[in-house]
Amino acid sequence: MASSQQAVRETGRGRASSSSAGGRKVTFGYHLVEGKTPHGMEDLHVAEFRRLDDGNEDGGDGGSTAVTAILINGETLAVANVGDSRAVAFDVRAGRAQQLSVDHEPLRERDAIEHCGGFVTEIHGDVPRVDAQLATSRAFGDRQIKEHISSDPNVTIEDVGGRRRRWWHGARRPRQRRGVEECFLQRLAEYAICIHGASMEHRNFHVHSSHVHYFEIPPFKEV
């Protein structure tokens, strides 16, 4: 790192920019600061998401969205997502769903898309799209419009210490959870309708258990 004669400056929110003798600029500084910025989990997620996207140069023209969740010491949950893949927490006792991810929609990020030379289409009967193609403003792949979209994730840090929740992420369900599964799926369907608006009420919307992964965060125990 020292031999490359690179200078790093922090820009806040766990991000950094750098300049090198070769004139190449690196944003988010994850190759250089090695987690020393105030938000190390953000740097980690950005680094991994970008590394994955950069490794797609020899791949096809397809694309994908993604969501990840890292549980730290049973107390802190770091959720990162690109596109419209979602992480939703379901509070069993309260019967309430909480979205932990951020939907990356073209209209929300129109300024950034247009700044990169792209455009957002709004056609009646269809969702807004980037360059009349992609329905999300961030994604992996999609090389044909790569210059107009981003693969940088939104990172949410959630304190889960002392609370008991059901976190759905997609493994086989144990028998003891079957009683709450139907309740969760119903709430998740209602949540999706609420987020997307009344237009979904006219669709045959259903969330199947095979689409959902599950794990439980145990209650925090004081010592």
From Swiss-Prot:
InterPro entries: PP2C, PPM-type-like_dom_sf, PPM-type_phosphatase-like_dom. Its EC number is 3.1.3.16. It catalyses: O-phospho-L-seryl-[protein] + H2O = L-seryl-[protein] + phosphate; O-phospho-L-threonyl-[protein] + H2O = L-threonyl-[protein] + phosphate. It comes from the Eukaryota. It holds the Pfam family PP2C. GO terms for biological process: regulation of intracellular signal transduction. Residues 1-212 form the PPM-type phosphatase domain. CDD domains: PP2Cc. PROSITE patterns: PPM_2. Gene3D superfamilies: PPM-type phosphatase domain. Belongs to the PP2C family. This is Putative protein phosphatase 2C 63. Keywords: Hydrolase, Protein phosphatase. One of its GO terms (molecular function) is protein serine/threonine phosphatase activity. It comes from Oryza sativa subsp. japonica (Rice). Residues 1-22 are annotated as: Disordered. The keyword Cytoplasm does not apply.
